[in-house]
Design a protein with these regions (language model features):
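C-terminal transmembrane beta-barrel domains of outer membrane proteins
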Residues: 1-212
Length: 212
């Protein structure tokens, strides 16, 4: 008997735009099941820009990327020699990962009332208080009814970047913004860390690696 079965699909499409631009699309779907299922870690870099590296994990995972790539400078003469051209990119990402029986909901438009966690109780020394199970004791805010489309457990981001070759390595400079497509929902989900305003703050990242 097999201890695990895994399906992993990676679909890509490239469309030339004018003479030097490229529209690049990718979809990856991963599912593993059995007594000892595999897990897929992803996030950051070219997979889910704006989120921490490998911050998504699950035996079920999906993510999609769309990128518009276009040249800005064909080549550059620098004090250390000729560098590769500089390319611009606009990107958007959508995805999520989850485990079996987790109760995962990628997105919804249904109205629901939620009670946000606004923080956690601490003692006089500033240490987190724990309940009998060892979990932090939460502080709850007032219930709020949320309406409209939003990502529940799914995540998305968008932004722009610059790419170049330096000393033989592809280097990326990205500016990205995270979103769940609903600021009222983000205010509840991230109430303990500053709400939507903090979640949507631009994030800058530098990474080395090839595009998909």
């Amino acid at each position: 008997t097999l201890s695990r079965q895994t399906l992993d699909a990676d679909l890509r499409y490239y469309q030339r735009i004018a003479t030097t631009g490229v529209l690049a699309l990718r979809f990856r779907g991963f599912k593993s099941y059995g007594a000892y299922p595999d897990f897929l870690y992803f996030g950051g870099n070219s997979e889910m820009r704006g989120y921490d590296y490998l911050s998504f994990v699950g035996q079920n995972s999906v993510f999609a990327n769309a990128e518009l790539r276009f040249p800005l400078i064909e080549a550059a003469l620098t004090p250390v020699g000729v560098m590769g051209g500089v390319r611009g990119v606009f990107f958007a990402n959508l995805g999520g990962g989850w485990f079996k029986d987790q109760g995962y909901s990628f997105a919804t438009s249904k109205a629901e009332t939620v009670t946000p966690i606004t923080g956690y109780q601490t003692d006089a020394a500033g240490n987190l208080l724990q309940d009998s199970s060892g979990n932090p004791v939460a502080i709850y805010g007032s219930p709020q009814t949320i309406t409209g489309f939003r990502l529940k457990d799914g995540r998305a981001s968008y932004g722009f970047g610059l790419e170049t070759f330096a000393l033989g390595f592809p280097i990326h400079f990205d500016w990205s913004w995270r979103t769940l497509f609903n600021t009222a929902w983000e205010d509840q989900v991230f109430a303990s860390s500053g709400g939507s305003a903090t979640f949507r703050k631009p994030r800058f990242a530098v990474w080395i690696g090839y595009d998909f």
